[in-house]
Amino acid sequence: QKSEKREKRRQNVKTDQGGKKVMGMKKKMLSATLCAVMVGSLAAPAFTVQAADDTLVYWSMWEATEPQGQVIQEAVDAYTEQTGVKVDLQFKGRTGNREALQPALDGGTQIDIFDEDIDRVNGMYGKYLLDLEDLAKDNDYEATANAGLMAACRDAGGGTLKTIPYQPNVFAFFYNKDLFEQAGITEEPKTWDEFKDVCQKLKDAGITPMTMDDAYATCVIGYHLARLVGEDKVKEIVTEGEWDDPAVLQMAQDIEELASNGYYSEMVGSNVWPAGQNTELALGTAAMYLNGSWLPNEVKEMAGPDFHWGCFAYPALTDGANGIETNNFGAQVFGINKDTKLAKEAFDLITFLTKGEYDQKLADETVGIPADTTNTEWPAMVECAKPVIEQSTNRFTWACGVESNVDMTPVIKENFIKLMAGSITADEFVSTMQDAAK
């Protein structure tokens, strides 16, 4: 009789893929029901109870040990406790995701939810994405979503919403407010002439105006060219070899002027990431650095708690194709597999992660930007980027299209670094690009 009781107890205990014991179906459904009654006191969105044997498979781009992974794990656990929907959360990391996701999707592996950056998901994995227009409408999702990011997702999806953004980011000039104050600078530059004035004031105060690392060199040339002629034309230049376009020489002359005036760090020609951001910007020897809004988090240990961050958009150029309303901004995004049998549950989990409590927690723990517009408290280190995000109505993709020709990217990077370092002239840069494109 005792052995029979033990056997019944054993059958009423199940073990999930993480090795943790969980309640049997009846107990779990009861617990989920109680949780659903209590959700009014929770900040995260509430959902109706689902069957306990529903299992979502979510491949994550994060590592389990990263702050993003830790918050996502906590949110998934809370979602499962609240709804009864089990989630097989697999942390793949960036390399694992990029190497394994495509063949897994091609092979029909059950993956209900996956994530990566907006362009990669909509581009590389686009044919596997579920149309989310109806789900978003039924859940009134966009009422508290960033309109610019949702528009970017639709644009990346060919006019249809196929992904949901989280962890927004923007690529702009980040700077040391204390150094600006020392140089008597009271306003952030909006035009190229104003930007050069800022550089000169910093130099006159004995401060290196800006630095750069090799990893982001293409972002500088991309931004400047795209300001002049727009991203589509930038792509045309690099893919069709149109390096004789007058905009290329204009860009090169603008950068040559910065270099000849001593506005770049003397280390810009030899900096290998993260040397510039860690040893020059973070330590206060250079004032500005063109980078993503993840930068303050990356250098916080070196910069310390007393570093006062500022941020402004890449300046507008005279007679340019666009201005400071157009920026390289984006996000990581969630996609749902078009073949999923749990579309509603998948969208509910994504909503749980991108609204309310866990969206705010993800921003706080990663020193990132909230996706939910009702989460108005941004981490102090990135609050400076809020005006740039809010003024952005048009979007550049990564490096503003200058990396569209993979065969040319290494040549562009190498010679643009030389241009910033002052070791080649604008004319030499143009001729080198023309020769390389032949």
Q: What positions do the PLM features span?
A:
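Extracytoplasmic/periplasmic substrate-recognition and gating elements
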Residues: 77, 82, 86, 159, ...
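Glycine-centered hinge/linker elements that transmit conformational signals in sensory
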Residues: 199-201, 239-269
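A structural signal for short loop-to-beta-strand junctions that line the ligand-binding cleft
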Residues: 104, 112, 139-179, 208-209, ...
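Extracytoplasmic "Venus flytrap"/periplasmic binding protein-like
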Residues: 78-145, 181-190, 279-280, 285-288, ...
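C-terminal capping/gating helix-and-loop segments adjacent to ligand/active sites or protein-protein/ligand interfaces
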Residues: 156, 165, 328, 365-374, ...
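Mature extracytoplasmic/periplasmic domains
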Residues: 129-134, 294-300, 317, 332-406
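Hinge/lid segment of periplasmic solute-binding proteins
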Residues: 118-172, 196, 247, 310-312, ...
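Short, well-ordered beta-strand elements
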Residues: 53-64, 85-90, 113, 162, ...
